[in-house]
Amino acid sequence: MTRHLIFAAMLLVCLFVCWNAVGARDARSAFSLEETAQDEHVMEERIFINPAGNREKNACLENCRSSPNCENYEFCSK
């Protein structure tokens, strides 16, 4: 009888540990996806918002954003 209780207790402990490990992995994965989305949004803001108020550069960025052939924004910084 005691062996069965010990076995059941060990089984419950193992299940609890495994369940927490799976939950932690899912939480890390969800956090990583959210963090990536936030990083992309921040990078987009850095590209299209010009805090110095340089209107020519902003116009260049807007034109480039609307152009399907534009691959990078390097020429706008010149």
UniProtKB/Swiss-Prot annotation:
Report which superkingdom the organism of origin falls in.
Answer: Eukaryota
Propeptide, residue positions: 25-28
Q: Where in the cell is it found?
A: Secreted
Q: Which UniProt keywords are present, listed alphabetically?
A: Disulfide bond, Secreted, Signal, Toxin
Query: Where does the UniProt annotation place the signal sequence?
Result: 1-24
PTMs per UniProt: Contains 2 disulfide bonds.
Q: Name one GO molecular function term.
A: toxin activity
**What tissue specificity is annotated for this entry?**
Expressed by the venom gland.
User: GO CC annotations?
Assistant: extracellular region
Q: Which family does it belong to?
A: Belongs to the scoloptoxin-04 family.
Q: What is this protein called?
A: U-scoloptoxin(04)-Er1d
Origin species, per record, is Ethmostigmus rubripes (Giant centipede)
